[in-house]
Amino acid sequence: MNKKLEGKIAVVTGGARGIGGQIAMAFAAQGADVVIADLLDSDAAAPVLSSIADSGRRSLLVKTDVSNEEQVRSMIDAAYAEFGQIDILVNDAGTFSQSPFAELEVSEWDRVVSVNLRGVFLCCRFVLPGMLERKSGKIINVASQLGQIGGIEMVHYSASKAGVIGFTKALAREVSNQGIRVNAIAPGPILTDMMAQETEEWAARKLAELPMGRFGEPHEVAPTAVFLASDDSSYYVGQTLCPNGGDVML
């Protein structure tokens, strides 16, 4: 079988579990070696690392806070030292909380925006020079449908993800004529650790609204990332693809 990412090197932030973990495993299944940048340790990342090995690919786990400039720089340096190049960057690392706006602390605003948006900036900032030099690369930023429609008591999270979508469009306009494609994914309600923070009442109400009548699974987002990382998406630039079960129809 012809693998879509054969011989490629991918960096996946937040790749130790959840959506990022599924993306990392799907990339390996399609022939890529994967650098996982995450705050979780090797024990927590073991299922993903084992799956990558089972696909016959190499992996590197680098403990990284994506909001920290020096840690991101060190992670990218480690990726180049191990693999020599970076073909694909997936910015999936993120954080989440809920708060009525009138009670939202400045420190919590800063924390969420720093991880979700500053982290995307930093990873792109340190990966992009190598891609520009080679005139080749794919950048995939994981946003959220709440960046498109907003979420109640989630102004900070929604703003950070809307920023990711805007960042994606602006960077795509700047670098697409240099062989680098930048796109985003805005998942809908996916069964991740973040969604586990929601109440049973919210879940029941949301399920009743969904055209498909069920929440999505992390593995259902991964094929979108494979598509955007491969040559199958050769004419996609600055787009936001939405695996959301029909929850939002644009």
PLM regions: where:
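Substrate-binding pocket helix/loop in short-chain dehydrogenase/reductase
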Residues: 100-101, 108-113, 195, 202, ...
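Residue(s) in the substrate-gating loop at a strand-loop-helix junction
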Residues: 144
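Alpha-helical segment proximal to the catalytic Tyr-Lys
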Residues: 129, 173-177, 234
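A conserved structural motif in NAD(P)-dependent oxidoreductases
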Residues: 210-221, 232
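Active-site helix of classical SDR
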Residues: 124, 160, 168
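Short C-terminal tail/terminal secondary-structure segment
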Residues: 149-152, 226, 237-250
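Canonical Rossmann dinucleotide-binding motif of NAD(H)/NADP(H)-dependent dehydrogenases/reductases
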Residues: 5-35
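Catalytic Tyr-X3-Lys loop
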Residues: 95, 102-121, 136, 140, ...
